[in-house]
């Protein structure tokens, strides 16, 4: 017996009862971004592997362990995008969008792919909403991005469930000095480090700060801190950011171990975290990447952005119980028709009602069936009202109009009067 077909592990179907919450989140965010003057960009899922090797960084877990990479028929190494920033930077460079210092404020959404161990809130195909800004070097735009996310949490009813963690990673020179000091400190304790941290000593030692292993965190208690090695310009940038967040009353925590998982970040780094989802607590993260464009061969261009995980945000909305009930509202009207003339009349009336009452949720019975079976389907649909059309109704140009959710009596309504009558009934809800 052949194996039944099923989805690949960690790549999930989003079923009809789940999609309203996704659409709600995406619509809310798109509307918010439009109000802030951001433009959508749509990016390909496949990119040349070199893009991520250069952008994310050799030696990172993403590049070394997690990317879906393959050779195409021309022998080119291609990768399914594990994140969105590198592809967005590539598009900005390729199409000259940042030339002449022009400011670009962009956003995108779509699936990303990483070969990780699937668990609640962490999948191999996952979806992100990302925002990237180019050619604005100051802390004011960093603050705008963070405030924008804060406003989104307020709109979604989850502001009290998330906490902003903030850090500065300084300049590349400051990080190089700090890296040297951190490596010297940890080298003396190398045998006590966990296996992953030992590997990171030669590839990306700053990521050791973010280790989830308790024994490694205990070793870091006496380690030098990045803030002791910061340059004056980075300190001023960070103070400017904090002043702006303070001005709008946005609370935050300084987390000196927050380094983010990708090599391209500098100066500002931030995450929004929650304690409502267990181990998968980060719902949004980002920061500044002023050197990334030049890494790809472009002129030095300031950049800053963030990405948020849609699956985790939807999971958090469900956990908090703040998904609006009206997202899953049933149909307003179910049209039952008996006989071919009635079916043709039902189709015509339905389209007239859709034109007359924008936003109406109207179902027309398909597949014929007896009066009893159609009424059963009307009731199961959850519709508030049913329209009934048979030979007599068509001959007299009327419909039977029956409430399905209260004790109201069935009425006979002329076709011409139906839009006004139905609109009045719907308005009474």
UniProtKB/Swiss-Prot annotation:
Its EC number(s): 6.1.1.21
CDD domains: HisRS-like_core, HisRS_anticodon
Highest taxon above the source species: Bacteria
Reaction it catalyzes: tRNA(His) + L-histidine + ATP = L-histidyl-tRNA(His) + AMP + diphosphate + H(+)
UniProt keyword list: Aminoacyl-tRNA synthetase, ATP-binding, Cytoplasm, Ligase, Nucleotide-binding, Protein biosynthesis
InterPro entries to which the protein is assigned, alphabetical: aa-tRNA-synth_II, aa-tRNA-synth_II/BPL/LPL, Anticodon-bd, Anticodon-bd_dom_sf, His-tRNA-ligase, HisRS-like_core, HisRS/HisZ, HisRS_anticodon
GO cellular component: cytoplasm
One Gene Ontology biological process: histidyl-tRNA aminoacylation
Quaternary structure annotation from Swiss-Prot or TrEMBL: Homodimer.
PANTHER family: HISTIDINE--TRNA LIGASE, MITOCHONDRIAL-RELATED (PTHR43707:SF1), HISTIDYL-TRNA SYNTHETASE (PTHR43707)
Official protein name in the record: Histidine--tRNA ligase
